Amino acid sequence: MNIYDNILKTIQQKGAAYLILLDPDKLVGDNINKFIRVCEDSGVDGFLIGGSLMLDGNFEPFVKKVKGITKLPVIIFPGSINQITSFADAILFISVVSGRNPEHLIGKHVISAPIIKQANLEAIPTAYVLIESGTSTTAQYMSGSLPIPRNKPEIAAATALAAEYLGMKLIYLEAGSGAKETVPNEMVKLVSEYCNVPIIVGGGIKSPNEARQKVINGANIIVTGNFFENENNWDLIKQFADSVHVNIPIKV
């Protein structure tokens, strides 16, 4: 079973999937092993690895180390064409459809496609939709694109639908790392009503209840990352997973 089909199966069985984003610039040393073990024990469904910036060139060794620790899916969430390695299971082949920067719509893809093929990576076509979040985010700056206004759910829905018609297999609604505000629930709901492919929601989700509300409103995959850079929050990972897995009764 490929990774995309595995994601679909998880969504069907659990109601939604919960992925945690690992940033090689932030998670270092022995904390990698410890954090991944906590995630596995807490019911996390897989990992995204990537970041808009890579300050130390440690991407491939980091992915290799993570794969050596866990049997959960490890998916590249690329911030640049340098973040490609055969040690991962798959890569989100991202097009920033909320913007009009040709480099992030098709330019970088032409360069990276042969590299991905050579690495024998499963590429998952993903529409990346940046949503206004109350602050300027690294993703916005690095992609050179404006986010969709958070009070314009109809624009997000039309954008997502167009991406689906173009053949995208995932829609990623992104508020941005460390966002002040999450993607609005009404926007998630409208996009889910328009689209038939899985919807990922990430950015600024800081509580299990927020994660649950995204799923209730139609999100199929929840991504958190920045929130768990603080080890004091690791105890909440299981609560996040339980909140996302709406088809599984919570054990008391």
Model segments located where?
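N-terminal amphipathic alpha-helix/helix-capping segment at the start of soluble metabolic enzymes
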Residues: 1-22, 32, 112-125, 132, ...
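Catalytic cores of alpha/beta
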Residues: 34, 76, 80-94, 194-222
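C-terminal helical cap(s) of enzyme catalytic domains, especially alpha/beta-barrels
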Residues: 63-69, 226-252
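Glycine-rich phosphate-binding active-site loops on the catalytic face of alpha/beta enzymes
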Residues: 49-54, 90, 94-106, 173-178, ...
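Active-site mouth loops of central-metabolism enzymes
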Residues: 16-32, 78-80, 130-157, 201, ...
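Hydrophobic faces of well-ordered beta-strands that scaffold small-molecule active sites
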Residues: 18-22, 47-49, 74-76, 91-93, ...
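Conserved anion-binding
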Residues: 83-164
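Glycine/Thr-rich beta-alpha phosphate-binding loop at enzyme active sites
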Residues: 142-188, 228-231, 236
